């Protein structure tokens, strides 16, 4: 996360080469693709150092999120739009969030779930494709 923050800072300053160096180091050290252009909110953390996480460079992730290992946040073919993840959301290990969708605030995405549709605030989704199994949750009950 520190390398991402450093690369994002260089990116926001308009320094062209240093964000790419940070991106390359993230790939080498963590086997992940987390780009400096990606907007990731404060206090968001990666479980197990973000091993094998792939996040599209145009994705937006809110504050206070937890992203498990092997998570993919990206587009779908023939679409240039990518997911937006609300604040306080937990993305379980191996989950895939794909396409022009919005994951609401304080949601829980189960391990290995494939999310292809919007998820309302305070919901739990699981499965392939992901389905809502609980609504109006208190996220502190889940992590």
Question: Predicted regions span which residues?
Answer:
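Terminal amphipathic alpha-helical/low-complexity segments used for targeting or macromolecular assembly
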Residues: 1-31, 130-131, 137-143
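Long amphipathic N-terminal alpha/beta scaffold segment
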Residues: 19-49
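Left-handed beta-helix
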Residues: 36, 41-42, 47-48, 56-57, ...
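Active-site-proximal flexible loops/turns
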Residues: 76-77, 134
């Amino acid at each position: 996360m520190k390398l991402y923050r450093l690369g994002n800072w260089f990116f926001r300053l308009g320094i062209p080469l240093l964000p790419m160096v940070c991106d390359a180091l993230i790939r080498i050290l963590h086997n992940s693709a987390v780009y400096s252009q990606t907007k990731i909110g404060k206090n968001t953390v990666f479980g197990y150092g973000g091993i094998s996480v792939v996040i599209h460079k145009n994705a937006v992730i809110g504050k206070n999120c937890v992203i498990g290992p092997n998570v993919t946040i990206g587009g779908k073919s023939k679409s240039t739009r990518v997911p937006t993840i609300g604040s306080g959301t937990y993305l379980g290990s191996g989950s895939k969030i794909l396409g022009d969708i919005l994951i609401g605030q304080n949601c829980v995405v189960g391990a290995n779930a494939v999310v292809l549709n919007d998820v309302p605030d305070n919901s739990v989704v699981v499965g392939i494709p992901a389905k809502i199994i609980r609504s109006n949750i208190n996220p502190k009950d889940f992590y």
